[in-house]
UniProtKB/Swiss-Prot annotation:
Superkingdom of origin: Eukaryota
Organism of derivation: Bos taurus
Full protein name: Dopamine receptor-interacting protein 1
SS bonds (residue pairs): none
Subunit relationships: Interacts with DRD1, the dopamine D1 receptor.
Protein's job: Could be a regulator of the dopamine receptor signaling pathway.
Source taxonomy: Eukaryota, Metazoa, Chordata, Craniata, Vertebrata
InterPro entries: C14orf28-like (IPR040029)
Amino acid sequence: MKTLFEEIKASIKNNYNQDRSFWRPVLPWGGVFTIKAGRKAVSCTPLYVEIRLKNTCTIDGFLMLLYVILNENENFPRELSLHLGREFVDCFLYLMDTYSFTTVKLLWIWDKMEKQQYKSEVHKASLIIDLFGNEHDNFTKNLENLMSTIQESYCSNWRCPTRVQEDQQRTINIKCGGLREFSQRVFCHGAPPFVVLNMQHWKSEDLAYVPYYLDLSDHKYLLEGATLFNKEEHHYSAAFQIDGHWMHYDGLRNVNLILLNKPPEFLLLSSLVYIRATEK
């Protein structure tokens, strides 16, 4: 049996102009997970026998991008295991490979998200988990450790209370009359396999104007994908490339994975995703 990634690559290779879509839905919006309740479940309070997921587009696009990234470089699964955990990476790849889409979403929710990042309630016999919100809050926030940076600064005033300062994530402001010199910001844990840039409010047509590569910490990063936002529907989708071909993924559509011949129209850019180039 071919994995999902192998099936997608095969569909690109065998593509005909009249059929630019993948043959089956991939990572559909939402999801229902049925619990096989045993005798002990009768005593549970509250009792529910299924889990229903709503508004999962805030994680769907990035889950699809993460799957593509992990398959693009044989070393990336090992590297990401250091940050996400070996068991998580292995389980994530297995579930995606075998089309277990609802389960892979639950894996991310329960393993990587905090309880306050989503709403949940029991309705009749269902536990409903609602991920409505912002993909930066529901996904990229949980990757901060992977992409964290640090910067040192030095003040010319010897009496400055914080003459030498280390700061993670952001530039600091200190009320002091001296001149503060900042070092180059560097990654805390070395160059990560990928970086995510917040590009909210850019139009998808602007994809033609974004840099296709970045130089960060003596490494080159290549544009691998983007997440897109439909303001009218308050809905996220994603675009990514495999073997030089761009594809658009939208879990809300019946035909949700298609080859692109131009950027999707009437959508805003939400994020750009760059992967570290392989050293030769």
